[in-house]
Amino acid sequence: MRTLLIGMIWVYQKVISPLKRPTCRYYPSCSEYALWLFSYSNFWYALLFSLRRILRCNSLFEGGIDYPIISKRITPIFGSPRLIKVWLVPLCPQKDWSAKGKFYLIKSMKVVQC
């Protein structure tokens, strides 16, 4: 199911989106936001927050920068990374322990090979 939705979003981005003018009020765009969530988080969480984002993308809301927030359990890796696709930025570092394990998901504009 996840692969199907990611494929549908990809088709929308490559085929349908170029045919109309850019209208998304947020960065990253709603389709990119959904793509990141479906790629890096739980299916139901991604579905809920993608729908919430799409419903907020109208003239009643201000818009702006809104990175997806994901929950991840990070285990240390002793060695250098081979490929960096995304950056995980802590939601509230060292201040709010209820936010422990929650990160902003920020896509690397250039894939970094180490």
Curated annotation (Swiss-Prot):
Q: Main site of residence?
A: membrane
One matching Pfam family is YidD
Sorted alphabetically, the Gene Ontology cellular component annotations on this record are: plasma membrane
Q: Which InterPro entries match?
A: Membr_insert_effic_factor_YidD
Q: Which domain of life is it from?
A: Bacteria
Topology in the lipid bilayer: Peripheral membrane protein
Statement: the UniProt record of this protein carries the keyword ATP-binding: no
Presence of the UniProt keyword RNA-binding in the record: no
Cellular compartment(s): Cell inner membrane
For this UniProt record, the keywords arranged alphabetically read as follows: Cell inner membrane, Cell membrane, Membrane
What is this protein's function?
Could be involved in insertion of integral membrane proteins into the membrane.
Its family? Belongs to the UPF0161 family.
User: What protein is this chain from?
Assistant: Putative membrane protein insertion efficiency factor
Organism name: Wolinella succinogenes (strain ATCC 29543 / DSM 1740 / CCUG 13145 / JCM 31913 / LMG 7466 / NCTC 11488 / FDC 602W) (Vibrio succinogenes)
